[in-house]
Amino acid sequence: MNARYRGFTIETDQSKEYGGDGSAPEPFDLFLASIGTCVAINVIVFCQKRDIPTENITVIQHDEKNPETNMREKISIEIQLPPEFPAKYRKAVIKVSEQCAVKRHIFNPPEFDIHVT
């Protein structure tokens, strides 16, 4: 299944367990990945504006799933900064990461209007 959005074609699939062939990420996997990549982009832009090298910055995301509800109960994001990263910007990196648009939409969700035509 492909989605077209703003000129991009985004491939998705379901796992074999749910009838797909596992050839592409499941839609929910893309959603989870969008959180981590959104944070990473915010960090990169922050650093670029201050001429801080970004090559050795890593963003790692983990999530905890409730086995009974199959819902994610916690998403943890670790931003690994190199030793030479300016100490005065460490807290600012967290603050800019919290401004991720994906995260903000989770906390203030849009109204959904699903209909058939």
Walk through the language-model features, giving the residues of each.
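Extended beta-strand/beta-hairpin segments
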Residues: 1-33, 44-117
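Short glycine/serine/threonine-rich phosphate/pyrophosphate-binding segments
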Residues: 41
